[in-house]
């Protein structure tokens, strides 16, 4: 993984984790996966050289960045779904910051509607 992206992910996780600690209501939290889980997903994507990925529940884009970075290694593409527009905007800004937005479609849609 590119060192700039890795540093960005580390900082983002720390920021989200600190923010989550302040939120009493679980629904107000970012609900990011743990770095070890994200790294495992990245390894699995790389091992299978997956080309088309679907993420349901973008939240703030932490796992999205991991998935997109892994997908780009093999010319893959990620579609990520989130029902909350503000979270899609946040995730999109993170994707742009690390130049992964070109391989990722961020859709503001209920996953149930998308999967019909």
Residue positions per predicted region:
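A short alpha-helical cap/connector motif
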Residues: 1-116
């Amino acid at each position: 993984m590119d060192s700039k992206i890795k540093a960005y992910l580390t900082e983002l996780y720390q920021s989200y984790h600190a923010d989550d600690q302040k939120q009493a209501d679980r629904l107000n939290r970012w609900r990011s996966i743990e770095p070890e889980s994200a790294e495992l997903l990245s390894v699995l994507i790389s091992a299978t050289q997956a080309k088309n990925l679907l993420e349901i529940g973008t939240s703030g884009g932490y796992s999205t960045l991991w998935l997109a970075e892994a997908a780009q290694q093999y010319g893959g593409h990620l579609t990520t779904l989130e029902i909350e527009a503000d979270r899609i905007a946040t995730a999109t800004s993170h994707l742009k910051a690390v130049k992964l937005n070109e391989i990722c479609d961020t859709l503001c849609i209920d996953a149930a509607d998308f999967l019909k």
